């Protein structure tokens, strides 16, 4: 049975059907790949990372600095031995070793960065937005520098991928067919690349709506791409080759994140304070009418 957790800018972490566990602005959650352990990013000026044992509620088992300002994303390596954090405020990414019980151990590895982009307000400096492990390389999307930063698992810097100026890469997803897709928050695009050489294959507006669409999270499932647009409050669906299949209302205001569990897609609508369910059983997302009220939801995690 799937358990749904919701991170937020509100009172704490919601365990659906069980209640709220108080936590400091837990805007992003990640699960250990093999253990009943949950991690949360406390998006504060002095960022914190928290670990919890799951089952019968959440029990905090660890807490440490994120190594930077305003951590907004976490990723756990498939081996379960490393957790990566992206600190949006100062652009520092960090690596944290995990022991056999999934607890923090040793000193964190800090990965600061420098640079800027052409946007006068949003790209004055680096802004790490997401961490993704692909093979034995950590990829960090940097909205502030229009780069995908790359590091070894020991923290050695590799050559970054430089994307279109002003794109503002927010989230990305690798797919088994050797492609990677990136949501451009600042230029409103969804772009596809060859994952080996990062050759651009296609690009498309993430939304057909007029005005600024502020794309947020992007993910892939069953050969389709799903991307949220916070400006028009929509979810867009594309094929792997860039053909748009649908764009539909997200069910609320300012859709920030979504997750798929089986035939259900959950959307965290931050400003309206709801997590809304959509069924994928008919091929394209359709609202089920199921809604969970959460103060400022920012992340949905089915485990």
Go through the PLM ranges and name each one:
Residues 6-9, 40-44, 85-88, 140-143, ...:
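Conserved beta-strand positions in repeat-built beta-propeller and related beta-rich domains
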Residues 17-22, 60-65, 109, 115-122, ...:
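A short beta-strand motif characteristic of beta-propeller blades
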Residues 20-80:
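Blade-loop segments of beta-propeller domains
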Residues 23-33, 67-78, 114-135, 163-179, ...:
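Beta-rich, blade/repeat-based domains predominating
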Residues 52-57, 95-105, 152-155, 193-199, ...:
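Short loop/turn segments immediately following beta-strands, especially the blade-tip
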Residues 60-130:
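Asp-box/WD-like beta-propeller blade repeats and closely related beta-sheet repeat scaffolds
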Residues 137-188:
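Loop-centered beta-sheet repeat module
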Residues 270-276, 286-303:
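Blade-level signature of beta-propeller repeat domains, shared across WD40, Kelch, NHL, RCC1
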